[in-house]
Amino acid sequence: RDLRMSRGLGDVYKRQMYLWCNGKFVGYAEDSFTPSEFDLTPYIKETGNRICVEVYKRSSAAWIEDQDFFRFSGIFRPVYLYAKPAVHLADIWLKAGLSEDNTTGLLTPELKLDGETEGVSVTLRLTDPEGYALYEGPVTGDTIELEGIQPWSHKTPVLYHAELTLKDAQGTVQEVVPYDIGFRRFEMKDGIMCLNGERVVFNGVNRHEWNPEKGRAIDADDMNAAMAVLKANNINAVRTCHYPDQSLWYDLCDKNGIYMIDETNLESHGSWQKLGAIEPSWNVPGSLPEWKDCVVDRARSMLERDKNHAAVLIWSCGNESYAGEDILAMTQFFHAKDPSRLVHYEGVVHNRAFAAITDMESRMYAKPWEIREYLESKPEKPFILCEYMHDMGNSLGGMESYVKLAKEYPQYQGGFIWDYMDQAIWHTDVMGRKVLGYGGDFGERTTDYNFSGNGIVYADGAEKPAMQDVRYWYASPADRAAQDAANAAAAAQADRTLAEAWQSRRTYPLVVTQGDGNLGVKGKNFEMLFSIAGAGPASLKVNGTEWLWRAPRPAFWRASTDNDRGCGFPLRAAAWMAADVFVTYNGMKVLEAGPDCVKVQFQFGIPTVPGASAELVYTVEAQGALRVDAVYPVSYTHLTLPTIRL
C-alpha cells in the first residue's frame, strides 16, 4: 500500500490513444515511438483490475508521422506494470564526460527524487569492467573526477557499471538502480566532429525496426542478429530512421561501440512535397504556433529516455519536414538541455533561412561532385550524407566515389546507407508459395509497390550481394590494402598454376579450310565453322556434340534495375534496346590463320546510335582454347551504354 502503481506503454503505433482503469479515464497520449506512462494508483483495487486501451489509427499526429513504411495500428512494444516506493529516483542523468587528457573521467550525476525526500540519501558505486571500484560514496551534485578511465569509442566500447542506492530517512534501502555508462567527449573542433579529440567518420546505415513475420514488433533476437551483421561488415554507425528505437537497441550500441544519430519521431513530407516538387505553402509543422509544443515535446521525450547512452552522439530533429520556427525550437531545446551532443537535420537544404537548425551540413543522395563542390567552398560546417547508396533491388554501385572523399576532405565525415533491411512481409502467393510481399501484394491501391525494399539485407535477414561492397569499402584503408594484396597474390598463383598446366598440354596443329561461305577450323577433338554470311560461328562441335544454336550477336541492353527506373535511365538509354534488335552486320575479316592460332573478326553497325559500332573477335588456339572478345569503341558522345555482351 506504500507503493505507487504505474503503467508503462512501451510504444503503441497509435498516433493517439486513451487509457482507462476499472472504467475510469486515466489519460491520453500521442507519439507512436516513445513511451507513455500513467499513474494508476488512484484507480486500482485489491483484485479484479481491468485496464483498457483505445487506439486510434487517425489523429492529428498523422500529419507528422508520414514515414515511408507499412502502416499498422496497435501495440508493438512491451507493456508493463510496475510499482514505485513512496520515495524513489524519478530521473537519473549520469553525465559521463572526458577531460582533454583522455584518461580523466568527469561524472556529474543529476538526480530527481519523487515523494517524501526529507532525510533521504543516495550513494553511488562505480566499478570498471573488471569489477574494481573507482568510486563509492554519496551523490552531492558535484562533478566526480576519476583517474585512469578508458574512453568509449567504436574501437574501445568500454562501459563502467554505476549503481545508485536510495535510502529513506531511517536508512532503509528503497531503490537500487544499475546503469552502464561510457566516458567520452564529442565536440565540434574547427568545423570537424571529433570524438575524444579524433575526427570521426561515420560508416553508417539507416535502420528501420522490422521483422517479416511481426512487422515492427521486433524482439531481442532480431536486434542481436542485426548487431552481429553490423559488426561483421564494418558498419560503425546507425541512424534511427525516422523515430526512436527500442531501448534495448541503444544498450547494444553502447556495448558494441556503434555511433548513433537518435532521430525524433517526425516526418511530414506529404505536406510540402507534391509529386516531387517542393511546395511548402501548408507545411506542417513549419512555423505554425499550434505545432510547436507538439514537436518539442517529441524531442524532449526522446532526449529524456536516451540521454544516458554513450552511443548517442547526435540528436536529430526528424526527417523530411522542410524547415521553420518549430523545428528550430527543437534544436534550441536540444542545445539548451544537452550541450554535450550535436544536432542534425537535413531539411534546411530546402530553406536556408533556417540553417541554424543543424550543426552539420546534411544531405540526401548528393552526387560526389556536389559534395566536393561544397567541401571546396571552405564551409563552416562538416558534411554528412544522412542517406546515400539507395540500395533498392540490385544496386549499391559507385560506393567508392563517396568513401574516398573521407581521405581527401577532413570535413567529409561519412554517410548512412539507405537502408539496413527490406521491409517486406511473408505471405502466400497465388501459386501457394511462401514469399516476401511488398506494397501492392496485399490488394491495396494506391501503393508504392516495392519502394520499401531498400535494404542491404533482405527482410528475412539474409545478406544481399551488395553487402560485399559495404564490407569492403567500410573497412579501414589498411584492411582494404591487405585484402587487395591477398587477392592479388592468390590470383597470380592461380594464373601461374593454370599457365603451367596449359603449357604442358600437347598441341595439335589446327587445320584451316577456307570456303566461299565458311571458314573451317579443325583441332584434335573439335571443329568449328565461321559463317561469312551468318555473322559469326555457325557450328562448334566437341567430340562430335554440337554446342551452338546460332551465331552469337553483340548485345547492348539489360533488364533495368529499380534505381535505373528511379533516375529515368531506361528512357535515356532506350536507343540501346533498339540496337539489340536492329544491329547490322558489316562483314568478316580473318586476322590470323595458321596452325597455332586462328583469329576472326566480325564487324557490326548500330544504326539506332549514330556513329556507334561494335566487333566480336574469336580466337582459336591449338591447345583447344576459344577466346571471344566483345569490343565497343568508347565514345563519350554516345548515350550511356547499359552493357556489352553476347
Write out the residue ranges for each language-model feature.
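Substrate-binding/catalytic cleft of secreted carbohydrate-active enzymes
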Residues: M227-L230, A237-D460, P465, D469
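Secreted/periplasmic carbohydrate-active enzymes, especially glycoside hydrolases
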Residues: R1, R7-M260, R298, L313-I314, ...
